[in-house]
């Protein structure tokens, strides 16, 4: 009896070890990120190695993604949980080996993976359009880095009233598709770079037949004119700067005018294609008793109705919600990044954007199985946990079951549906600011 039992156990262990030696982690994770795309990005960035290591560079991309999805876990634990290392004599990987592998990978390869997957997933998603235009928005965000000498030298601190900030910071500008929350492009620099300078880098990455919503911080006639001239029907909408001078050319409707704005010599010097004047469309709307002026490049009143355009600008807030999902939900409100060196800081930031898009693209697939639901009507926090659990499940699954597991994930949209938001039961009230110490009631002054 016992010899037979030991024989069966030995056969089982032999099969497991044989399967583990032949298993390729890229095979199971390839449905999320194409292994050929990762290899191509590594080759284009010049990140190649001839030595066969236990942590291949292709799998280190998944480590960077896991860093963003599992913010509270150490790096070596993420590698062990995802099981992305090649078989070896030791069952686990040392923490120092993960750091060395990150340094070999660098940031350029991860940036290329994010850029290519952003374009690929954006083109593969059937976005809803408004008057034939895809709705985009750009906005800036700050990231805090660990206070190390290397980061301090690479990322100058912002000063307030002559006092430097507590941590070095990175300034980032992202472009987002508003209905799916997919990031389509991103650029970042130091606090010495203005958001307009970073937004210039997004012009070439913006597609045709798009409408980009911006806040008033991006008001620059050179930037806006260059945005329109970079392609076909690349429109923008932005609040008019306070005190801006313009000349009304023609009235298009109630609160709707075609206007002409003069450019400055400094702007024409910086933007060679900028003329002396810029023609735009000015919309004047009243919201809750406040008059707002919106400037846009959509001058065709027949194609773009002014009444709908005024309501369209409120959707710009979707990118703010996207930043909240990244910082509070995915990063667990841990405002300081992990990496202690500038190259690894950039690598970590590209990994955060890549992980966010990965979750959002899976939410798009789940929404396709739900009639009448959009991706932004699903729970982002639940989807994050579901994607991370699936990544760990794929490593232990046989190759034949991987398509079935992926179909199961896409059909799990019922579990992450957000309930319909209930209406307000009581009127909104602004409460009095709490004070640290109690205050005595004021005595009425006596009349002399």
Identify the meaning behind each predicted range.
Residues 83-99:
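Short, basic interhelical loop/turn and adjoining N-cap
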Residues 1-75, 90, 102-105, 112-115, ...:
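Single, function-defining residue in the core of a domain
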Residues 85, 105-108, 120, 332:
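A short structural micro-motif
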Residues 108-124:
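Short Lys/Arg-enriched helix C-cap and helix-to-coil transition segments
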Residues 78:
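Short alpha-helical "recognition helix" segments of helix-turn-helix
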